[in-house]
Amino acid sequence: MQVPQDGEDLAGQPWYHGLLSRQKAEALLQQNGDFLVRASGSRGGNPVISCRWRGSALHFEVFRVALRPRPGRPTALFQLEDEQFPSIPALVHSYMTGRRPLSQATGAVVSRPVTWQGPLRRSFSEDTLMDGPARIEPLRARKWSNSQPADLAHMGRSREDPAGMEASTMPISALPRTSSDPVLLKAPAPLGTVADSLRASDGQLQAKAPTKPPRTPSFELPDASERPPTYCELVPRVPSVQGTSPSQSCPEPEAPWWEAEEDEEEENRCFTRPQAEISFCPHDAPSCLLGPQNRPLEPQVLHTLRGLFLEHHPGSTALHLLLVDCQATGLLGVTRDQRGNMGVSSGLELLTLPHGHHLRLELLERHQTLALAGALAVLGCSGPLEERAAALRGLVELALALRPGAAGDLPGLAAVMGALLMPQVSRLEHTWRQLRRSHTEAALAFEQELKPLMRALDEGAGPCDPGEVALPHVAPMVRLLEGEEVAGPLDESCERLLRTLHGARHMVRDAPKFRKVAAQRLRGFRPNPELREALTTGFVRRLLWGSRGAGAPRAERFEKFQRVLGVLSQRLEPDR
């Protein structure tokens, strides 16, 4: 395949399908490795790579980075994750021939292009219409009518020219005008353009007379305030989704909220007093697994959850947990109104401030609730010993998938390790012995890697650099700011206190880096709605204590459930 150095012949590529809806694209993808490139109507015409990988259809938006116009270099670069390319064909060629994954999160590899078999020009009526006024079809040349005169700008240009199709960069003298169109702006045309236009018109004599031109203008220039500037710096621009009515909105958008870039802060934004109650965890969200009223530990729901977790490998579950933790912490998906209400740009900064008290309590409850649910996954196995050992192995593998260098979700890792180190679980000698006998690698990883790592994180000495970590360990700092005393001898507790405060300061400083790393981890990831809900704080709270008990005081709820876990542990392995 010829690799062009610019994006002018994208429409000529066999794998480019023009404007194509998500559903029709998925219908064309039959086998693993099949892929095509399409223009997404819901993403403002931006190119999207659709592929099938491991039985699932995945969609990756190609981001455009505008460059300052200079002779001899492209006007834009295109990228999926980190590496940038001068054109979309060059990007596709690199990923296809090199067998490189489109994203590290999914590992999807494209190998077989799905060729477009239809005519070159496709109309909007064939696929999904864009929301809003009619627009020029992206990345396809406009089909000019017979009544429009030939021009060098159109005769010499190939059938696809993104730069030429934009009104902001198209010369006004090159715009076609019928006899009834009003003159928008008179500008002297270069001599070469006039001469070439005269030569081009010699070959444009039609056999029949052209149709009568319309009485209304065929093309209108937008106001100067609406046109984007032709001068631009090297700034990634992610177009925003056009607003749609509720009846037209799609339940699964092309670009989820965790992939959208944060809005730029206004320079002269007026100061607003931060609100005392900031929450990123919706408490009244509708549930697809629980009814409006439910009792604690419903057997049918527990059976459904068991099958749900068995269907997903630990790496996928870790990404689901990272997504929910980033939302609960306020690292991703924070709106401009929320930033204005809390006075800072992310929840990591809010945790260190006095008015972050409510968020700190929410994260403490989330940590303890997930730890109790993990312990229940082991203690609720009333079958043979091997079943409980398999549950332990599943938690250990999930912890390994959450550790730094993998998903990098340290709050999720702390919750899973809290379940494994809970006294009601750690006392099960026969179960742990069976784990060492049947799943030796998991047992060694728990003893030699996970336990020392968790000890270092709790003492403020573990890894916390962005890149290795997507979401830092906030529990020690949250407990400290909520007034909990640091355990241990006085000299050791003072050193631990200083390390915790030092780590909190670095966490706030590196909050934008953590946000970028988390977004890269989740780019291209499409979660299972049920598994994602099963990892939210509100769902786990209702699962453990029921719809009525979920509103009881936190200390009372945890004390009662600890006793329930103690009874289950004694039933499995009574004291000698």
Curated annotation (Swiss-Prot):
The modification Phosphoserine is found at S123, S125, S147, S180, S201. Residues 145-165, 204-227 are annotated as: Disordered. One of its GO terms (molecular function) is phosphotyrosine residue binding. GO terms for biological process: JNK cascade; small GTPase-mediated signal transduction. InterPro entries: Ras_GEF_dom_sf (IPR023578), RASGEF_cat_dom (IPR001895), RASGEF_cat_dom_sf (IPR036964), SH2 (IPR000980), SH2-Ras-GEF_adapter (IPR051853), SH2_dom_sf (IPR036860), SH2_SHEP1/BCAR3/NSP1 (IPR044102). Interacts with BCAR1. This is SH2 domain-containing protein 3A. The keyword Nucleotide-binding does not apply. Phosphorylated on tyrosine.
